[in-house]
Amino acid sequence: MNIGLIAHDSKKALMQNFCIAYRGILSKHSLYATGTTGRLIEEVTNLKVHKYLAGPLGGKQQLGAQIAQNDIDALIFLREPSNPKPHDPDLNDVIRMCDTYNIPLATNLATAEIIILAIDRGDLDWRELYR
């Protein structure tokens, strides 16, 4: 499966810890992330991550294009809901695209864990039918 990873600055350490905890599962899949998030994940896990540009420099749009082409099977986007960012409209577009294309989306740690465990069990294998 192709898994997208995005994290606001205040959630990047949480994303790193999540990827450390689920490294065994993530290592079986292709990972895609915005630039800084991807680099930070690679540093602590040694997982290979396809890195787009940094989020504010167009990485969100690159990931969004991959969602629109049905090339992402799940997106984990750890965001800071109480501190809006100037580029949040771009992220809202990514969230909307996940809804449009039936891409499972986690925006917090609890749902991220549910999605990653579902992937490991094969619960999201139905995504293969969409390709």
Where are these regions (language model features)?
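Mid-chain, well-packed structural core segment of small domains
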Residues: 60-100
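Short, glycine-/small-residue-rich phosphate/pyrophosphate-handling segment
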Residues: 110-131
